[in-house]
């Protein structure tokens, strides 16, 4: 499978990846017709100064070759297709369990942190989990390339189980945070692997639809997770975490077994046997000790560089959420020192990646225009999104005397919109074979959704305003996210799919962490200030601090009382300072979207390699003898 070289861009030539594959049957193969000549189609899908050479494409890891063998084998006969459907059902079951877990445990955060008198620590938790889990994705991606996709699923399951056990048994806020980090790695790792496998096994025209389909369980789970939350909170929030230490292994094991079986069957193919024999010969020529193999694996996943990245961003951003607890706030030397050290570490990371790292976490070959634009769009999308959503559940908790169930329903409004319109966006990709303009429309809708929440000096408090804003934000967000995901995966060859699919959420989650870091000091400074201003003078400063630390105390006063109405006004005033920057920053991804490429979404696995169509029985086989497994 040899990569095609980049053509120069002129008035009469466009790059190969923007060519439209006409579905003409010729021994089962698809033929690329003449490329479109419009300016839109002339956009460079990848860096023209850095092509994917034959040597680059041949240096392929074992895990990539294994999943390619699976992809080829499932289209050869009905049995392979049935097994593929079974695997699809299995990962959909994983998505169901993950949807229930995230829909419920997100609501438990308020109660868990309140039990430790650390409600405002939610932002610190969000920063820590966002950065660490996102930094782990490139490691998981490289691990899946070096070993296999099933092996990585097993590793993710291990993180899941450990995290749930630690959180369920936590006696301090520190233990709760550590367990939450493990859960976040497991949850984000599962989502990442599901997305990666969908990218491995589907063509571009179905990519967005199938990826969005993995999120559809949220459409159903939202209606009964409220009952689960209500029942758990009435007894003990810890069991809400602990039960998933049993559920997740039960639902993930079938998916792992089926994928392992598919790999085993695919490895019986003669071409794969030749590759394995060649790899065995290479091993015999260059024998390495276990320590040498381990060191090579550490270098290949760029473990040192990713640790620098994660530690640097964590140390830089955590002071924003810790200043309210530090003596003298920003005047505390520790806060200043953390920011300085974090900045220095990030500079060191940049230098290490550019000049020292033998296997950079972000190789230059994937830094094409399409990928960079997708990163910019999602980076600011998440940054603005975290500004709006970080304390939005707490805000709605204060506004109305909803039951736990109804409160959970409302908090999942945006989730439902994201899932429903995500499938719609994927269907539009299948019908029109393009994604750019739908993404632009989505970003405009998202801005309108933010705007509905803003009133002069206050945030909206009406139920209709809140509901419509969440629906529009979810709708617009789904159009954008699905577009970024598809364009990112389309812009690189299959051998780089794992790294590109992990780097996009890495940088966008850093954007979310920055948004959380900005939201935390705004919330921690504004809420106590406005609580003191709008609460009756009969409430002393200690009570004000207690209301701020434990928002459930405010709920003890019915809506309409002087104390409750004063608290609502204080929270509404504070949310205004989060919503204004959120809507302002949302114009940046909108501008970037106009620079996005607009690949034709056809039968190919990606848009930069020519011979990428799924092979069916009777098709001419693609030789794999030139592939070398590292």
UniProtKB/Swiss-Prot annotation:
Keywords in alphabetical order: Cell membrane, Ion transport, Iron, Iron transport, Membrane, Phosphoprotein, Transmembrane, Transmembrane helix, Transport
CDD domains, per the entry: MFS_ARN_like
Effect of a null allele: Impairs heme import into cell; simultaneous disruption of shu1 exacerbates the effect.
Annotated compartments: Cell membrane
Topology term for the membrane: Multi-pass membrane protein
Main location: membrane
Annotated region (Heme binding), positions in chain: 522-576
Gene Ontology, cellular component aspect: membrane; plasma membrane
Positions on the Cytoplasmic side per record topology: 1-79, 142-154, 198-208, 263-302, 357-370, 428-439, 487-502, 596-630
GO biological process, one term: heme import across plasma membrane
InterPro entries assigned to the protein according to its UniProt record, in alphabetical order: MFS (IPR011701), MFS_trans_sf (IPR036259)
Stretches that traverse the bilayer: 80-100, 121-141, 155-175, 177-197, 209-229, 242-262, 303-323, 336-356, 371-391, 407-427, 440-460, 466-486, 503-523, 575-595
Inducing or repressing factors: Induced in iron-deplete conditions (at protein level). Repressed in iron-replete conditions by transcriptional repressor fep1.
Modified residues (Phosphoserine): 10, 38
Region span, Disordered: 1-51, 610-630
GO molecular function: heme binding; heme transmembrane transporter activity; transmembrane transporter activity
Listed PANTHER family: LOW AFFINITY HEME TRANSPORTER STR3, MAJOR FACILITATOR SUPERFAMILY
The family this protein is said to belong to: Belongs to the major facilitator superfamily.
Function: Low affinity heme transporter involved in the assimilation of exogenous heme during conditions of low cellular iron.
Name of the protein: Low affinity heme transporter str3
Organism field: Schizosaccharomyces pombe (strain 972 / ATCC 24843)
High-level lineage: Eukaryota, Fungi, Dikarya, Ascomycota, Taphrinomycotina
């Amino acid at each position: 499978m040899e990569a095609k070289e980049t053509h120069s861009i002129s008035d009469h030539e466009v790059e190969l990846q923007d060519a439209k594959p006409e579905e003409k049957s010729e021994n089962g193969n698809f033929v690329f017709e003449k490329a479109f000549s419009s300016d839109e189609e002339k956009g460079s899908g990848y860096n023209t100064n850095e092509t994917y050479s034959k040597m680059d494409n041949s240096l392929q890891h074992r895990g990539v070759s294994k999943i390619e063998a699976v992809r080829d084998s499932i289209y050869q006969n009905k049995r392979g297709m049935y097994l593929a459907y079974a695997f699809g059902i299995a990962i959909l079951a994983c998505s169901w369990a993950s949807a229930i877990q995230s829909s419920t445990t997100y609501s438990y955060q308020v109660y868990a942190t309140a039990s430790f008198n650390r409600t405002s620590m939610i932002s610190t938790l969000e920063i820590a989990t966002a950065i660490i889990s996102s930094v782990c994705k490139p490691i998981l991606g490289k691990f899946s390339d070096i070993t296999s996709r099933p092996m990585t699923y097993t590793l993710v399951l291990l993180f899941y189980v450990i995290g749930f056990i630690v959180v369920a048994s936590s006696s301090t806020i520190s233990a709760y945070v550590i367990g939450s980090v493990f859960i976040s790695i497991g949850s984000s790792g599962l989502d990442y692997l599901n997305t990666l496998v969908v990218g491995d096994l589907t063509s571009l025209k179905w990519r967005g639809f199938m990826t969005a389909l993995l999120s559809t369980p949220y459409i159903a789970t939202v209606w009964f997770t409220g009952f689960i939350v209500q029942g758990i909170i009435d007894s003990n929030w810890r069991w809400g975490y602990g039960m998933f230490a049993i559920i997740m292994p039960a639902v993930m094991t079938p998916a792992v077994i089926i994928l392992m079986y598919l790999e085993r069957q695919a490895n019986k193919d003669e071409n794969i046997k030749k590759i394995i024999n060649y790899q065995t010969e290479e091993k015999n020529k260059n024998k390495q000790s276990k320590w040498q193999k381990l060191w090579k694996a550490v270098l290949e996943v760029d473990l040192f560089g990713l640790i620098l990245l994660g530690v640097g961003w964590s140390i830089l951003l955590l002071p924003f959420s810790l200043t309210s607890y530090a003596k003298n706030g920003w005047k505390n030397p520790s806060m200043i020192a953390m920011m300085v050290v974090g900045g220095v570490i990030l500079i060191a990371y940049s230098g290490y990646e550019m000049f020292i790292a033998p296997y950079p976490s972000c190789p230059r070959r994937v830094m094409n225009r399409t990928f960079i634009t997708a990163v910019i769009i999602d980076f600011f999308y998440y940054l603005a999104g975290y500004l709006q959503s970080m304390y939005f559940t707490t805000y709605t908790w204060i506004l109305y005397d909803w039951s736990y169930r109804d409160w959970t329903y409302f908090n999942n409004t945006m989730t439902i919109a994201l899932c429903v319109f995500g499938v719609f966006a994927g269907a539009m990709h299948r019908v029109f074979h393009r994604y750019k303009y739908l993404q632009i429309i989505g970003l405009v809708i998202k801005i309108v959704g933010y705007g509905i929440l803003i009133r002069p000096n206050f945030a909206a408090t009406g139920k209709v305003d809140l509901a419509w804003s969440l629906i529009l934000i979810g709708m617009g967000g789904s159009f954008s996210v699905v577009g970024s995901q598809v364009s990112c995966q389309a812009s690189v060859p299959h051998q780089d799919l794992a790294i590109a699919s992990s780097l996009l959420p890495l940088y966008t989650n850093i954007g979310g962490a920055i948004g959380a870091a900005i939201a935390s000091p705004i919330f921690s400074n504004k809420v106590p200030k406005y609580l003191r201003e709008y609460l009756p003078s009969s409430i002393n400063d200690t009570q004000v601090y207690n209301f701020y630390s434990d928002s459930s105390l405010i709920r003890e006063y019915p809506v309409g009382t002087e104390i409750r109405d004063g608290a609502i006004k204080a929270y509404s005033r504070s949310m205004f300072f989060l919503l204004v920057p959120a809507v302002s920053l949302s114009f940046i991804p909108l501008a970037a979207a106009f620079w996005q490429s607009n690949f034709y979404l056809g039968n190919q696995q990606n848009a930069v390699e020519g011979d990428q169509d799924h092979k069916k029985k009777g098709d001419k086989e693609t030789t794999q003898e030139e592939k070398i497994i590292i």
